[in-house]
Regions:
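Short helix-coil boundary/hinge micro-motifs
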Residues: 1-119, 164-166
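BZIP DNA-binding basic region
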Residues: 96-154, 160-166
Length: 166
């Protein structure tokens, strides 16, 4: 749960400040809901990339955190005066902070070419990303983390191989 809370503090989803769980039971519930959402998002993205509609169970599980949060939307204006839709969140409990994540995932698959949505190629990474590279060949969620680790591992393997051959 500590890493989840660090991420939540950084991401600041609507309602998080007022609903951050203080007791252990609520923290565990939020952690379990976040892990469940991660599995559901993986299923959603996998289906999207394969050109399939998500399973009904995936849709139901994705709809749960969305239903906990979204109270209403209204038309507003940006700082430049252009129209935009403002979502007014009314979170019911701490796990409701996961609702905007689920909503953004649905909006993402509506707007992204399935060929550009990728799972990170790093063995232990669970992240998905949108490949915006010119050639469409990006394999890592982040070159600073996963890509760098892969390059370092290849370098170490070459060094060990060269040492063994010498």
């Amino acid at each position: 749960p500590a890493l989840l809370f660090q991420w939540m503090e950084h991401a600041e989803p609507p309602g998080w400040t007022s609903l951050k769980p203080a007791d252990i039971s609520a923290q565990r519930t939020l952690h379990i809901e976040a892990l469940n959402l991660r599995v559901v998002l993986d299923q959603l993205f996998t289906a999207h990339v394969a050109g399939h509609n998500p399973k009904t169970t995936t849709e139901h599980a994705l709809g749960r955190p969305i239903s906990w949060t979204l109270a209403s939307s209204r038309l507003g204006h940006s700082e430049r005066g252009t129209l935009l839709i403002e979502n007014q969140y009314a979170p019911l409990h701490a796990a409701a902070a996961l609702g905007p994540i689920a909503q953004n995932a649905v909006e993402l698959i509506q707007s992204v070419d399935p060929a550009r949505l990728r799972r990170c190629a790093a063995h232990l990474c669970l992240r998905w990303f949108v490949d915006t590279s010119k050639g469409g060949r990006r394999g890592w969620c982040s070159m600073a983390t996963c890509g760098n680790r892969a390059k370092a591992a290849r370098y170490r393997a070459r060094q060990e191989r060269d040492t063994a051959e010498a």
